[in-house]
Structure formats: C-alpha cells, structure tokens
C-alpha cells in the first residue's frame, strides 16, 4: 500500500510507535509533534461505545462546554420572542427573531452554526426538520439548544462547546480544540468530553461502555 509523504513523516516522529497504546497526556504530546499543514488543524477524538444504536433507549447524544473553547468563531441564531429574545441579544447572539427567522430559514438561509430555540418556539421550528436535520442544526433538549435559559445557552455556545452523537456503528467523533492549543488546554477539553459521555450512558447499556 502506498503511503502519503505526510503519513511517512508522522510515523517518523520521535517517540511514536503506531503499534503502541498511549495515555491521554502522552498521546496529546505526541500529536503536537506531528508535522502539520498550512492551517490550524482541529484535534478530534473517536470513541467506540458499548451501546446498540438500533435500540431507541440506547442513543447517546449531548453537548458539553469546553473550558478552553474550540478555537472557532461560532455564529448563533436564536428563535425566541419577548424577554427571551432580549436576553439572547444581550448574551451576544448573532441573529435573534421569531417568525422572521423561521421564514428566512424556510427560504434557504442557514448562515449560522448553532440554532437555539425556546420551548414555545419549537412549534415554529419543528417543520424545518428537513432543512436543519441534515446539517445537525435542529434544536434539541439533549444538546441544550431547546431551553428557556437562552442567555446561558448563547454564552456557552459562543465560549465554545462540543456536541456529540453516536452514529450507527456506536462511534462518537468529537473535536476538542486546535493543535495550536497548549497540551493542558487540550487535556482539559478532552477530560470534560469523557465526563459528559459517561454521564450520557444509557441505563440499558450493559458491559463495557467506553
């Protein structure tokens, strides 16, 4: 099998053995030694969970605020009215509205990374499932994007958070920062992701989980 030049350089990193298992701190230290590319790469971790995603009571989904952030600028849209809309604006949401935001989305507008809605606004948002679902933008209580506490949700989204969801193979892929972050920042982000996954373990899941 032919290997890319980048792969060969990575294998040649001092102290790295592709056949060996490493602890989290050691793995992060090695990751930062790998030759990079011309942009600030995202560090991502993958977990194989001991769940059966075919069973509705074994879905794993959630979100967690990352203490060191994500290193990305996030555009937040909020569907709310009244006091909740004012709270969202004060918290720094990029787009805030009610029927007007919903109508914009219906017309194809998706110039945002996270959509937050109050519970009473979901009657307007639910019909947008076909447009929002494929991009993972549909608000969901499990990820904290359907909430009355819109101010907190906006601030958390702006500060940096990671969403996770097990796929059909029970795998979860979660970004936990940029390679430009120092090792302690990446480790702190990694640790809170693991804690969140443990808390999200379905009660019906048996045996080894992570």
Where do the PLM segments sit?
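Flexible, glycine/charged-enriched surface loops at secondary-structure junctions
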Residues: 39-43, 200-209
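Generic N-terminal amphipathic, Lys/Arg-enriched alpha-helix
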Residues: 1-17
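Translation machinery proteins
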Residues: 24-86, 107, 113
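Residue-level signature of catalytic and energy-coupling elements of molecular machines
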Residues: 27, 88, 133, 210
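Ordered, amphipathic secondary-structure segments that act as subunit-interaction surfaces
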Residues: 74, 79-93, 99-100, 123-124
């Amino acid at each position: 099998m032919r290997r890319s030049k980048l792969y060969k350089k990575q294998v040649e990193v001092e102290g790295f053995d592709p056949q060996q298992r490493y602890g989290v701190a050691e793995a992060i230290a090695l990751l930062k030694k790998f030759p990079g590319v011309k942009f600030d790469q995202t560090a991502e971790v993958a977990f194989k969970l001991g769940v059966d995603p075919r069973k509705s009571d074994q879905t794993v989904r959630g979100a967690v605020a990352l203490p060191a952030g994500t290193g990305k600028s996030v555009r937040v849209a909020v569907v709310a009215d009244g006091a909740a809309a004012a709270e969202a604006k004060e918290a720094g949401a990029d787009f805030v509205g009610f029927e007007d935001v919903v109508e914009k989305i219906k017309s194809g507008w998706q110039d945002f990374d996270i959509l937050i809605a109050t519970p009473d606004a979901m009657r307007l948002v639910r019909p947008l499932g076909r447009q929002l679902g494929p991009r993972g933008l549909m608000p969901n209580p499990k990820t904290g994007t359907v909430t009355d506490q819109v101010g907190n949700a906006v601030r958390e989204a702006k500060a940096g958070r990671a969403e996770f969801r097990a796929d059909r193979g029970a795998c979860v892929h979660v970004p936990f920062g940029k390679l430009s972050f120092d090792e302690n920042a990446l480790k702190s982000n990694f640790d809170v992701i693991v804690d969140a996954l443990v808390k999200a373990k379905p009660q019906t899941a048996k045996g080894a989980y992570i």
